[in-house]
């Protein structure tokens, strides 16, 4: 009940998070990311959804290796840029867009130099999430990496903002 009241208060006062996902979808998607790591390599997904005002609502996980089966061949995310056409086709078919991305690290949730230099979607405002520990333990805002792309390979770190930046659960808009 406290969570619902806090959500309604934030919505009513115009303090919307940048990104939201319902609990069931988040749990299923994160479980699948953890499974796909096989505890040996990274995994990741494009987060498809829609922009509602200033809030990005996640509606579906599109796993990197479903689009590019070889993207984890070296243990880290190395997505073949020629496969982006398949991503855009899926977005058109589903009437959604890539509103964020997520990938899994073996340990912490800090961005690696490669993460900072190579955004999956190099668009200002794009959100990149990083789950630590192969998605086995920490999986909720406040314990995961939340990064907003500012352009020119610069990022804003929202990781410490908890659900003020990324909210998992019901959201009214």
Briefly describe each language-model feature range.
Residues 104:
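Residue-level "edge-of-site" marker
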Residues 1-98, 107-173:
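Conserved beta-strand-loop surface patch within small alpha/beta domains used
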